[in-house]
């Protein structure tokens, strides 16, 4: 396959019993994951730290973001949800497929492998909207 480590995780059905984030706030954590290193290394560790023209954070030219690496391995890449990273970037370079609410994932599946960053509705305050039978008990093993 194109991504033997990711394929191995998927094939073996790994369940993560403990998960950790790279930062205590969402934008810094999301930025670190997509860059592949601690947000402190590139200055993106403060929540929404690259917002204005004067405060933009530019990554070094030799940095490749995870979706760019996936594209090089033959994947279609898309983002459905948050893409506010703590650095300046070219959205069209990072994601090569424009996803909309009517995109058929089966259609994507048969064209080529895809890497999608997907944020579902939810967040910190919306857990009361999830029906009880769909909630996951983190203590189950």
Q: Which residues does each PLM region occupy?
A:
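Formylglycine-dependent sulfatase
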Residues: 1-141
